[in-house]
């Protein structure tokens, strides 16, 4: 069955070729052209998540695309979210609600039919509201061993009868071969939908590339509709594999050019690269701060001497805590005299105990935390997903927006720690402020609070404070989205979308 609305499908020759960023750019380009446009990804596998205004959980990438389109994120934009937990298992989030944890085979056996129904219903609702649906695929559409259960790629395009663009990453090498091979592995009815080829991450002379593009168009009969320049600045990665593929993601280019001298006068913040790190988009506002040097530290590495260490969110808090203990990083943290921060799962690790009475993360039991704050956490099957508005009590009074995504409740001993916010059970600190943690994702997005905290750190070092900022990181994100659209629009043939 084919739906009636207008759509464009974007698939790729492999993962991390730039599908997400292209759909993001197209959302902003069409918005600027006065179109009502919505993003869509049937199934996303990611630990970077966001909570919609009605408390539904979707991939952060689709939230970013919604912001690019100038609309609020909605669960219809990502009806299926798979959150890997290790050992070939994932938590399944269907229509924004967690429905259980399954191995891959179990998931497809039990949930394939209801998941595909959810995809069709989500598309139907979006088509009633928007002029254009920009659909993003996942991985490659040509995985022949997975095609019978592929919910995210050409099954969506065929359902919509959607013209489709195929994206290849030329920076990896072999882009033309990847395009040709992908096309050969598609079924004839799928290949007939491919209306354009996009070459992404191009660096160099277009004149030198042109003979290859001419050959590709002649060989495939499909036009090249875009050659997109390399983007040398950061928008949020879709998942942690993007970080693994690009270990320099957080290495400030000024540092690589100028070395240690240029880091003087900047706070150094080390974020622990947990095995199941989640919601690392929390730290994009810190990355944008010119007076902050942000870096990853892996379990097993030397911690060094940063000003702050952050334990980020985790999909499997206990397993990541065990990784810190086994690799010696937990002991390094105990010997460390700087500031320690925990976000969500990182907050739970900072406490004295974490109980898993029903074995949701493995073997049932109660386990010792890092012991930095007098907190006790009990992991529970019920998942908290909600947006939050509150006010901070420390380091100064400031309005706060953010969102919670966690399974577990935490209780604090008020004789040994203080609340961070007016809202209860959202975050705590020790009496000195050296160690604190919060369940709140998006905390650093709050300009005023972030600058207050950074200035509190700077005063500890005898440095001058930074100017305080009003507003929210969303304003900087808007500038990045505008910049992306302006950069790529001249390099795309948008005739199909502007008709």
UniProtKB/Swiss-Prot annotation:
GO molecular function, one term: ABC-type vitamin B12 transporter activity
InterPro entries for the chain: AAA+_ATPase, Class_I_gatase-like, CobQ/CobB/MinD/ParA_Nub-bd_dom, CobQ_GATase1, CobQ_N, CobQ_synth, GATase_3, P-loop_NTPase
Entry similarity comment: Belongs to the CobB/CobQ family. CobQ subfamily.
Keyword Cell cycle found: no
UniProt cross-references to SUPFAM superfamilies, sorted A to Z: Class I glutamine amidotransferase-like, P-loop containing nucleoside triphosphate hydrolases
Keyword Transcription regulation found: no
Annotated metabolic or biological route of this protein: Cofactor biosynthesis; adenosylcobalamin biosynthesis
Provenance organism: Synechococcus sp. (strain JA-2-3B'a(2-13))
Database matches in HAMAP family: CobQ
Residues annotated as catalytic: 344 (nucleophile), 441
Highest taxon, organism lineage: Bacteria
GO biological process annotation, one example: cobalamin biosynthetic process
PANTHER family in alphabetical order: COBYRIC ACID SYNTHASE, DETHIOBIOTIN SYNTHETASE
Annotated NCBIfam families: cobQ, PRK00784.1
Keywords: Cobalamin biosynthesis, Glutamine amidotransferase
Organismal lineage: Bacteria, Bacillati, Cyanobacteriota, Cyanophyceae, Synechococcales
Function description: Catalyzes amidations at positions B, D, E, and G on adenosylcobyrinic A,C-diamide. NH(2) groups are provided by glutamine, and one molecule of ATP is hydrogenolyzed for each amidation.
Residue ranges annotated for the GATase cobBQ-type domain, each copy included: 266-449
Protein name: Cobyric acid synthase
């Amino acid at each position: 069955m084919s739906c009636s609305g207008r759509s464009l499908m974007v698939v790729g020759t492999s993962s991390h070729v730039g599908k997400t960023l292209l759909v993001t750019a197209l959302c902003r380009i069409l918005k600027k052209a006065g179109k009502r446009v919505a993003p869509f990804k049937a199934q996303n596998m990611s630990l970077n998540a966001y909570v919609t205004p009605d408390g539904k959980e979707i991939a952060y990438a689709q939230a970013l695309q919604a912001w690019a389109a100038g609309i609020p994120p909605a669960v219809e934009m990502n009806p299926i979210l798979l959150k890997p937990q290790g050992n070939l298992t994932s938590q399944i989030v269907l229509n924004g609600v967690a429905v259980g944890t399954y191995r891959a085979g179990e998931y497809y056996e039990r949930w394939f039919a209801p998941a595909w129904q959810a995809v069709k219903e989500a598309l139907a609702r979006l088509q009633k509201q928007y002029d254009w649906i920009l659909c993003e695929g996942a991985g490659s559409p040509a995985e022949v061993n997975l095609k019978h259960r592929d919910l995210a790629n050409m099954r969506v395009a065929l359902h919509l009868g959607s013209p489709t663009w195929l994206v290849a990453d030329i920076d990896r090498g072999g882009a033309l071969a990847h395009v040709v091979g992908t096309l050969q592995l598609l079924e004839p009815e799928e290949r007939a939908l491919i209306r354009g080829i996009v070459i992404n991450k191009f660096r160099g002379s277009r004149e030198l590339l042109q003979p290859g593009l001419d050959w590709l168009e002649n060989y495939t009969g499909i036009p090249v509709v875009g050659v997109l320049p390399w983007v040398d600045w950061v928008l949020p990665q879709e998942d942690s594999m993007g970080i693994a593929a690009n270990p320099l993601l957080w290495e400030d280019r000024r540092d690589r050019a100028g070395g240690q001298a240029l880091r003087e006068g900047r706070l150094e913040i080390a974020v622990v690269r947990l095995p199941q790190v989640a919601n690392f988009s929390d730290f994009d506002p810190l990355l944008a701060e010119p007076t902050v040097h942000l870096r990853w530290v892996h379990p097993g590495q030397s911690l060094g001497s940063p000003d702050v260490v952050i334990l980020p969110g985790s999909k499997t808090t206990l397993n990541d805590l065990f990784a810190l203990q086994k690799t010696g990083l937990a002991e390094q943290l105990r010997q460390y005299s700087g500031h320690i921060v925990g976000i969500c799962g990182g907050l739970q690790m900072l406490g004295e105990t974490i109980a898993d009475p029903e074995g949701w993360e493995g073997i049932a039991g109660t386990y010792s935390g890092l012991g930095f704050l007098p907190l006790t956490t009990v992991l529970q099957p019920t998942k908290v997903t909600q947006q939050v508005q509150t006010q901070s009590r420390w380091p100064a009074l400031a309005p706060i927006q953010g969102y919670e995504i966690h399974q577990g409740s935490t209780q604090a001993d008020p004789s040994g720690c203080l609340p961070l916010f007016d809202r209860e059970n959202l975050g705590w600190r020790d009496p000195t402020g050296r160690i604190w943690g919060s369940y709140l994702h998006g905390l650093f997005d709050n300009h005023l609070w972030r600058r207050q905290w950074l200035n509190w750190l700077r005063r500890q070092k005898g440095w001058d404070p930074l100017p305080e900022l009003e507003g929210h990181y969303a304003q900087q994100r808007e500038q990045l989205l505008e910049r992306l659209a302006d950069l790529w629009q001249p390099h795309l043939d948008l005739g199909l979308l502007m008709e």
